[in-house]
Amino acid sequence: ESGQIKTTADLDKAIDRAARADLDRRWLVADVTTWYPVTEEPQRHFTNAVAAYARKDYKAAATEIRKATSYLRLEAGRATGAPKQDLDRSVAQLDMLAASMETGAVTDEHTLANAFANADHALAVAHRAKATESWARKDYDKAGYELKAAAFGLESAADWTGGEAKAGASATVAEARAVGEKLASGGAWTRDEVTKGLDALGHSIDELGRKIGRAT
């Protein structure tokens, strides 16, 4: 169908055109191989925003923030309940940040890091919830991809937070990523290790949420 978005590249072009009103309708998640690469896009745009801010290109920084926000909107469209509310809060925070950035009102990188940590944490919460749902449905490959995406969200949020948070999350991230890869690739796994990975990831996400003042 004309106008439908089927690839990450198509999606990025649509976001470049700021065509957000009907983005959810046109974004076709055909399978996880199309969907999964999208999960790392917000972090890429967050990193670009910090680089643009450092060189005082505030308009470019605002544009990068808005691109990242569009991806969060897509995830909010897939989410339900508390994870959706968490993503919606981050979308609102990022919208305000982009507006402030454009006027030159953002005075330090800490403001960016805080907002980006919140957003990545919200993504981790949402993906972990989806991983649990997929696991319960015995949709094991989907659970694996969601688990890996949740691990990436936690890692990214911890990176923005820095210090003990970054060090504390590293082991859990590695464990969840390894289990997720086994599930996604059809490798050998046990129910105990998957349950342990999901539980440990949930605990680490909650712990980081408390550190950054994010309700979970």
Describe the predicted segments one by one.
Residues E1-T216:
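Long, charged/polar, soluble alpha-helical segments
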